[in-house]
């Protein structure tokens, strides 16, 4: 347990459900734990007792990835006799997916077909999932290569990215998605069993992530937050820039989003997607804000002495060994922190002739937010907007042309 974890309260101690078995937290709330084929080796799913159209059953929060191990765990749950830690013979009445990442939505189509249940999801998550679940095209592969080159990996990349290995590709972990869904929206109240759950959306980790907050049942105050990936007890949520949205500002969006959760009651039981249920939401939010502030300071210091690519920052921000899969996320997160300072006007962005994008500190008098100084980017100085020229325009680096923005 790291020092920050000691500031949180884990009411269940070290108890964990076995894969494919239900662990009851309340009469109406149960915990499932499914395997993942990564260093982060599990995901938590949640079963909520429900009634829909006079039918008794479950509402499922997230599904697990489409892997043989997870499908086997679901088979075990469905076949378990009543009272043996399975579904007790009750159907899934609906699925609510917090967001579109494969470990959260990968088996939605299989479960929808098995139980005839609807998928509930925010429209931003559903739409992006439909795009990413398609087999990659030649155009997308070219886009990905260009993005990897911009990170500093070279073309072809000099280092393998396990996140892009075929067996871990998005469309393999999400082989299908239900053709229709029911949209959920920020602030909406969803009645599940004897509880009302308020939808609280956020971004930075994904486009329109939905957390669910209940103040309690009709019988008692019992605040619970199903936080998804927005607040995790042991690790920080990935806030990465990806090739599909290369101009994003995920770190700032994420920090704004988690502060919205401070309206939850102080003794809220947090049910995260990874790690153990905990109490101490407000303390954990403060820890995460401090963590990102420290990382931004490290980026400032690195860029004060030289122009840095995302790859340059990985050993500075991540001091532990990374496997190939983790490297992909680390690169995206390094770029996310660079973008935060670039959007704040603290860094200048430089496009080098080798395709690598680097960032360096601006002088105080030249610190202009990119929205004001960069209406668009051009490959030649003649098309650069006046604001961009005033802020530095184009520089020569090592004898080669470099664009600044």
Protein language model features and the residues they cover:
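Conserved beta-strand hairpin/beta-sheet module of binuclear metal-dependent hydrolase folds
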Residues: 19-83, 211-230
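Short, contiguous alpha-helical
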Residues: 113, 202, 342
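Intrinsically disordered, low-complexity terminal tails and inter-domain linkers enriched
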Residues: 52-54, 153-160, 216-221, 363-403
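Active-site HxH/HxHxD metal-binding segment of metal-dependent hydrolases
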Residues: 69-71, 75, 79-191, 219-223
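Histidine-centered divalent metal-coordination motifs
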Residues: 96-104, 203-205, 209, 274, ...
């Amino acid at each position: 347990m790291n020092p920050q974890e000691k500031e949180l309260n884990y009411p269940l101690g070290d108890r964990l459900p076995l894969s494919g078995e239900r662990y009851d937290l309340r009469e109406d709330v149960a915990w499932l734990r499914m395997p993942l084929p990564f260093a982060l080796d599990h995901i938590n799913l949640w079963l909520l007792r429900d009634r829909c159209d006079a039918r008794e059953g479950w509402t499922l929060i997230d599904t697990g990835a489409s892997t043989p191990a997870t499908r086997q765990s679901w088979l075990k749950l469905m076949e378990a006799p009543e009272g043996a830690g399975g579904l007790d013979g009750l159907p899934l009445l609906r699925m609510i997916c917090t967001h579109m990442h494969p470990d959260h939505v990968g088996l939605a189509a299989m479960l929808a077909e098995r139980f005839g249940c609807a998928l509930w999801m925010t429209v931003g998550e559903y739409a992006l999932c439909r795009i990413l679940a398609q087999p990659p095209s030649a155009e997308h592969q070219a886009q990905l290569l260009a993005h990897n080159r911009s990170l500093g990996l070279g073309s072809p990349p000099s280092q393998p990215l396990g996140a892009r290995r075929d067996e871990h590709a998005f469309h393999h972990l999400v082989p299908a998605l239900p053709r229709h869904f029911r949209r959920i929206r920020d602030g909406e109240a969803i009645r599940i069993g004897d509880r009302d759950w308020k939808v609280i959306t956020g971004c930075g980790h994904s486009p329109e992530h939905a957390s669910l907050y209940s103040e309690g049942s009709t019988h008692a105050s019992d605040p619970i937050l199903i936080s998804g990936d927005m607040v995790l007890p042991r690790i920080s949520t990935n806030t990465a820039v990806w090739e599909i949205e290369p101009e994003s500002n995920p770190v700032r969006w994420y920090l704004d989003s988690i502060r919205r959760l401070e309206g939850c009651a102080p003794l809220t039981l947090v049910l995260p997607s990874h790690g153990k249920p905990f109490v101490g939401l407000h303390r954990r939010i403060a820890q995460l804000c401090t963590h990102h502030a420290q990382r931004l300071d490290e980026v400032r210091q690195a860029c004060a002495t030289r122009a840095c690519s995302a790859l340059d920052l990985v050993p500075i921000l991540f001091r532990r060994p990374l496997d190939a899969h983790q490297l992909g996320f680390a690169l995206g997160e390094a770029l996310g922190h660079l973008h935060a300072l670039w959007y704040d006007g603290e860094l200048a962005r430089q496009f080098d002739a080798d395709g690598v994008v680097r960032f360096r500190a601006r002088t105080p008098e030249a610190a202009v937010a990119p929205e004001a100084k960069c209406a668009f980017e051009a490959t030649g100085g003649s098309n650069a907007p006046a604001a961009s020229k005033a802020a530095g325009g184009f520089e020569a680096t090592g004898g080669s042309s470099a664009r600044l923005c």
